[in-house]
UniProtKB/Swiss-Prot annotation:
This is Integral membrane protein GPR137C. Residues 1-48, 105-120, 189-205, 268-300 are lumenal. The keyword Transmembrane helix applies. It comes from Homo sapiens. One of its GO terms (biological process) is positive regulation of TORC1 signaling. It is a multi-pass membrane protein.
Length: 429
């Protein structure tokens, strides 16, 4: 089993024997081998699998595009972790959809296994290599978002001071991943010896997959810290999320990305001498020769399963986690507003509760729950409460008879508005 060793950034594709052919991919030894092999997958099966994955990527593109429009509709912040992650997933799904749609122009062959020989460097890198950079950037944004949640919950100034360093660290990691990916792709696309090709692939996999593993470890640390905070769930619910969703999505992303990175490192390390591996472990074929794949039916099914796990599941998890939601403005049930808070109505001069003290708050809370009927007197000093629609009772002074100098303030809400002069009772001679 002889396969070429490609880049570090993608899912596994099984292969069972390669034969070099002419750059045009026409008649040659490879075509004869493919025709002679009875175990090869028919072109219709390859086309069906390509169409299936293209539809899945197109559905992800449409869903992410819809979420971005919903963010604008709900008047959310245009530049946030949520919008950036959705945009990166949108761009990633667009590139993957374009790649799998090329199967129609390649007579049903899977473009991942049989890239066109005449494809120039930049389109080749953009379709085959750049999506891995987008996935790594999405993982970095997920780390930054959870770090932001920890800072918001703890409200610690020392964490805010390190926020800039944290942002710079993940930005530098993303740039390093991009530079290594682009540089190695440029070296491999040229005419390089076989030994240099092996070491280029090894260095690329070692750096990029190590960055994936380090980001996964940091994501584990952030999730562990969030689960230990009792108030983290309240903050996440105010953003339309929950602690359970955060743990599940983070665990799925960590498990899949770290397992793929470890697999890539193992395959590159083992195949340094023989270039043999049970799977074609990357998206792009870094050899400058065109190849024809002779793939059995079982290996092709395994390829589809691995592609679904390492590509679709983490991408859909991130998009569903950062989907746009209409936030509930009433945060009292979630505990964001305590019982001493007032209504959201804005008062300028006539706030009816501007003189309330702390002793009045339990009485106000019980009155909101309906514990006091309209006919019951509150017993405040100098107040008159209504026992019906037209009768009022004056509450006597607590320390004796009412003096002539203390006016009585009516607080009953069902007074006739035409009797303005009856609001204050003055001594009558």
């Amino acid at each position: 089993m002889r396969v070429s060793v490609p880049g570090p950034a993608a899912a596994a594709a099984p292969a069972a024997g390669r034969e070099p052919s002419t750059p045009g991919g026409g008649s040659g030894g490879g075509g004869a081998v493919a025709a002679a092999s009875g175990a090869a997958v028919p072109g219709s099966v390859q086309l069906a699998l390509s169409v299936l994955h293209a539809l899945l990527y197109a559905a992800l593109f449409a869903f992410a595009y819809l979420q971005l429009w919903r963010l604008l509709l709900y008047r959310e912040r245009r530049l946030s972790y949520q919008s950036l992650c959705l945009f990166l997933c949108l761009l990633w799904a667009a590139l993957r959809t374009t790649l799998f749609s090329a199967a129609f122009s390649l007579s049903g062959s899977l473009p991942l296994l049989r890239p066109p020989a005449h494809l120039h460097f930049f389109p080749h890198w953009l379709l085959y290599c750049f999506p891995s950079c987008l996935q790594f950037s999405t993982l970095c944004l997920l780390n930054l978002y959870l770090a932001e949640v920890i800072c918001k919950v703890r409200c610690a100034t020392e964490l805010d001071r390190h926020k800039i360093l944290l942002h710079l660290g993940f930005i530098m990691a993303s740039l390093l991943f991009l530079v290594v990916n682009l540089t190695c792709a440029m070296l491999v696309h040229g005419d390089v010896p076989e030994n240099q090709l092996k070491w280029t692939v090894f260095v690329r996999a070692l750096i990029n997959d190590s960055l994936f593993i380090l980001c996964a470890i940091s994501l584990v640390c952030y999730i562990c810290k969030i689960t230990k905070m009792s108030s983290a769930n309240v903050y996440l619910e105010s953003k339309g999320m929950s602690l359970c969703q955060t743990v599940v999505v983070g665990s799925v992303v960590i498990l899949l990305y770290s397992s793929r990175a470890c697999y890539n490192l193992v395959v590159v390390t083992i195949s340094q001498d023989t270039l043999e591996s049970p799977f074609n472990y990357g998206w792009d074929n870094l050899s400058d020769k065109a190849h024809v794949e002779d793939i059995s039916g079982e290996e092709y099914i395994v390829f589809g399963m691995v592609l679904f796990l390492w590509e679709h599941v983490p991408a859909w998890s991130v998009v569903l986690f950062f989907r746009a939601q209409r936030l509930n403005q009433n945060l009292a049930p979630a505990g964001m507003i305590n019982s001493h808070s007032y209504s959201s109505r804005a008062y300028f001069f006539d706030n009816p509760r501007r003189y309330d003290s702390d002793d009045d708050l339990p009485r106000l809370g019980s009155s909101r729950e309906g514990s006091l009927p309209n006919s019951q007197s509150l017993g405040w000093y100098g107040t008159m409460t209504g026992c019906g629609s037209s009768s009022y009772t004056v509450t006597p002074h607590l320390n004796g008879p009412m003096t002539d100098t203390a006016p009585l303030l009516f607080t009953c809400s069902n007074l006739d508005l035409n009797n303005h002069h009856s609001l204050y009772v003055t001594p009558q001679n």
